[in-house]
Amino acid sequence: MPTSGSYDYSVTALQIIESAAEDIGVIAAGQSMDADDLATMLRALNLLVKQWQGTSDKFPGLKVWTRQRLVMPFEADKNRYLIGPASGDDRSSVAMIVTQLGAAKAANATSVTVDSTADMTAGDQIGFQLSAGGIGWTTISSVDSATGLTLPANTVGAADSGATVYAYTSKAQRFVDIEAAVLRDWSNPSQPIDMSIDIYTDVQQYENLSQKLAPGDPTAILVEYQRINTAITTNFVPPNFYKSLRLTVIYPAEDYDNASGADDIAYPQEYFAALEWELARRSAPKFGRQWTPDLQEHWRIAVAEGVNFNPVNTSLYFEPARESSDVGSPFTSY
């Protein structure tokens, strides 16, 4: 018989939950989950994936597939920005479109010409580097041609020909870790220039600055992870709006919202067994099931082998003395 020739095997939250429930004897093979038991294990699965997001669990492979690169434009007279999808958060996106005005824009113009409208759609947010400084934001009413856009009635402000234009559909998510940061110069959007900047690892580094609101291109940023967004503070107030931050970050794990467990698991295939057995381990006490040495060995193999895929440059060692009832990661960086 020939091989399948396919490589797209996937599982749903329900399938991971049922496999974990079978492992600890909550259900027999082929049985369906009771609604209350399903809700209990779905909640445990969500708690698990949130704990395993980013790098806090020391699973190096997670850095590869949750990595995103976002662009964060600057605002006038501002050095603290909130990154996240909430309405009050600042404008950053992992799919930022950057171009330039092909002709000057009058203060209240509704018809504008840009170098390229590629990837722009009606309803997108669009911002123009203004002649008076700062960025004026509005929405796109329609994309009329390869270079033409229509805007709603607005008082965004005047912008010069060649001014930088930013556009995006969705804001970036609150990220849970940052790996790199650069200051990007968009003077030539087709060939932007990146300048490396520092990431403060201690709030004291920022607090020791004698002038925190001095104008200038940022050379360092402070990153503070909040409950619903991530705060970015620059060490200077950016005066040049044809420049932006470009951050390489780790996105959070997705939620599993569907009450019946129909959501696909948003993990690579090599993590499926690790998720199954870690969920089994965390769920066993909830159902009064004993965690036996045999189950512990199955768990150890599944988790150890799963997390060794797609490694980055991180040194790991296994802690064999960890108690089997410990629901944290069995791995530690050094």
List PLM regions with ranges.
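Short alpha-helix capping/helix-loop boundary micro-motifs
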Residues: A109-D115
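Glycine-enriched, solvent-exposed interface loops adjoining structured elements
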Residues: M1-A106, A118-Y334
